[in-house]
Amino acid sequence: MMKKIDVKILDPRIGKDFPLPTYATPGSAGLDLRACLDSAVELAPGETQLLPTGLAIHIADTDLAAVILPRSGLGHKHGVVLGNLVGLIDSDYQGQLMVSVWNRGQKSFTIEPGERIAQMVFVPVVQAEFNLVEEFDSSERGAGGFGHSGRH
């Protein structure tokens, strides 16, 4: 299913020097987001930085949201992940998409202008209304928490 999302280009290099986000393959769930930097940024071990993407989106549809996720290669090969682990973009947000990057690795890592730093996935949203109860109907699991359902 393809859904149209309004996007505003905030950095004139997007569409010229840096491509617009696209799906890499027909089966891709995420669109790559790029660092819209004027110069390279060095991330020391343990350091976080907030990087602009040069894009703003307005999802508008309250049945959708977007999540910003790490790119697997950056995390696995270089220890660079998202500083907030997952970014949530609500349907009514209209500001620039920013990416918090965190170097959890042991070596400094340099992020170049236009480098792919995260991916964005659109997800369905269900808003819940709470129904206050004194007790729950019993279930097989009950209140068993972490590790309760077994190891295998």
Curated annotation (Swiss-Prot):
Residues bound to substrate are R71, S72, G73, N84, L88, I89, D90, M98
MF-aspect GO terms: dUTP diphosphatase activity; magnesium ion binding
Which cofactors go with this protein?
Mg(2+)
Q: Could you tell me the EC number(s) of this protein?
A: 3.6.1.23
Reactions catalysed, semicolon-separated, are:
dUTP + H2O = dUMP + diphosphate + H(+)
Top-level enzyme category? hydrolase
Q: Name one GO biological process term.
A: dUTP catabolic process
* Family matches, as InterPro entries: dUTPase (IPR008181), dUTPase-like (IPR029054), dUTPase-like_sf (IPR036157), dUTPase_trimeric (IPR033704)
Q: Which UniProt keywords apply?
A: Hydrolase, Magnesium, Metal-binding, Nucleotide metabolism
Record pathway: Pyrimidine metabolism; dUMP biosynthesis; dUMP from dCTP (dUTP route): step 2/2
Q: Which HAMAP family match?
A: dUTPase_bact
Q: Which family does it belong to?
A: Belongs to the dUTPase family.
Q: Which NCBIfam families match?
A: dut, PRK00601.1
Q: What is this protein called?
A: Deoxyuridine 5'-triphosphate nucleotidohydrolase
The source organism is Serratia proteamaculans (strain 568)
